[in-house]
Amino acid sequence: MMTLIMLISLITSFIFMQMKHPLAMGLMLLIQTFLTSLLTGMFVKTFWFSYVLFLIFMGGMLVLFIYVTSLSSNEMFSLSMKLFFLSLSMILMFIVFSFFFDKSIISMFINNNEMNNLFSTNSLMMEDLISLNKMYNFPTNLITLLLINYLFLTLLVTVKITKKNYGPLRPMN
């Protein structure tokens, strides 16, 4: 599963370099962020960090989407056959490579006892529970409460500013 996600991530990276339309580039960045979040969640065995990472990237992408749509709203979008054949050939090369690749080399890395001890599920689950407890226990719960209050205050100020102008912050010409 992880190799498939890494393959798709590699293909979207190559496709991103060939894109010319800003909205298509934003879509590729969004797909890349989703795949990175999936990989991060698989490594850590909990999706806390990957969920926060995805939300932060989504917030940034929404701001970029607003800027891009206001700047290049009437630009035409066309699909390139060169890009399609490039991605198709990369997928076929990966399939052929996976059929002819020596499986014993892969099993040597997977069946390593040191790696199994390092990434045992019990130690990772206990580590995740301890790290979640640390966030809400005494020394760090003050920082969490401060962050919650700061975000709430920012929300109130933003609502007050937009209510005062009765519309968007940017004047329309």
Curated annotation (Swiss-Prot):
Cellular-component GO terms for this entry: mitochondrial membrane
Job description of the protein: Core subunit of the mitochondrial membrane respiratory chain NADH dehydrogenase (Complex I) that is believed to belong to the minimal assembly required for catalysis. Complex I functions in the transfer of electrons from NADH to the respiratory chain. The immediate electron acceptor for the enzyme is believed to be ubiquinone.
Broad EC category: translocase
Transmembrane spans: 24-44, 47-67, 81-101, 142-162
Species of the source: Aedes aegypti (Yellowfever mosquito)
Molecular function as annotated in GO: NADH dehydrogenase (ubiquinone) activity
Keyword Lyase carried by entry: no
Sequence similarity: Belongs to the complex I subunit 6 family.
InterPro entries: ComplexI_Subunit6
Protein's gene: mt:ND6
Lineage, top ranks: Eukaryota, Metazoa, Ecdysozoa, Arthropoda, Hexapoda
EC number: 7.1.1.2
Topology with respect to the bilayer: Multi-pass membrane protein
Keywords: Electron transport, Membrane, Mitochondrion, NAD, Respiratory chain, Translocase, Transmembrane, Transmembrane helix, Transport, Ubiquinone
Keyword Iron: no
Subcellular location: Mitochondrion membrane
Protein name from the UniProt record: NADH-ubiquinone oxidoreductase chain 6
Reactions listed under catalytic activity: a ubiquinone + NADH + 5 H(+)(in) = a ubiquinol + NAD(+) + 4 H(+)(out)
